[in-house]
Amino acid sequence: MRDMEMRWAAPAPAARGRGRARRRAPDQPSFSSTLLDAICDSMDEGGEDGRTRNAASAAAKKRQEAANSYHYYYCYKPSLAASYRAAPALGSTADCPGRGYFSSSEVEYSLRRLRPIRTSAAGGAGDGAAVARKQRHEQPDVEKTAKTKPGSASARACRRPASPGARLASLLNSIFSGKRPSAQRPACSPDYPEPACSTAPPSSSSSYARRPCHAKTPRTPPTTTTTARARPSRSRTVRFLDIDGKVAVAAAVAGCRRIPVMEVEADTDDGGEESSDASSDLFELDSLAAIAPAGGRDGSYGDELPVYGTTGVGIRRDIGRRRPYGHAPCRSWSRAV
């Protein structure tokens, strides 16, 4: 028993001195034991190297995050987006930022192009004086360019698209300003005098009687030595025709002929059976045969069917008489065409 205790307790000091005992069989070491021994050795021997490696990876990660933040700030800022697009691509097609990849060389190039923004007045009065002198030196050049190219600023302003708000504001200003464009009359040329307007006195029934005609005296052209002959002044006369007057007078002057127009006056009796237009008039053949026998006066109504509206007794008598042209019941009048 004591020998067994001595055998188990003997390798303990060596294990404490080495740190961890290697569990390895002297004859046939297994794969798991070999892997475990390698892991333990790497942890014991490379403790300090692992710490430095972790610190280096953390620093590299921080630098990468900072570069990414600068990259996205520079790309999505509206004032710098155009310059970023115009910058030449330094990397390959795989490093193109449009495809979602990132290139540190592009970020360094873009960051070098950024200008520092001064946020505090720590520069002192010397820097302000230098800037003022620089502006004074640059001002004559600006004035010269403005004089040589007066239309460049206006053309640049015209190329800018107007926003809807600006258009609405200009429209409201033009409405409420109260300035209306004055109607400019075209200037008459001195060679051709303005014609005078003379009107004939129209009748009282004319619709144009109350419209005055502005008569102006012809302007005398200026006498110059270059004009060979003076042009005579011509006057034009405007006359208004009386619309409501007698048209027959104008027609007679124009040589129009009269065409007679007949207007037949129909005798209408309310409630009379003779002028009835009902369908029962078609069945009055017996009474009509008694009044106008077969053959009639000229034998024209014997075997005919009655016509609608002509089966009355009085109407058939009137038709049989055949009144001459211009009889009393008819009224004739003439119309000029």
UniProtKB/Swiss-Prot annotation:
Primary localization: membrane
Subcellular location: Cell membrane
UniProt biased composition (Low complexity): 150-163, 195-209
Top-level taxon of origin: Eukaryota
Region (Disordered): 1-32, 120-163, 179-235
GO cellular component: plasma membrane
Entry annotated with the keyword Transport: yes
Biased composition (Basic and acidic residues): 137-146
Stated family: Belongs to the BIG GRAIN 1 (BG1) plant protein family.
Name of the molecule in the record: Protein BIG GRAIN 1-like
Source organism (scientific name): Oryza sativa subsp. japonica (Rice)
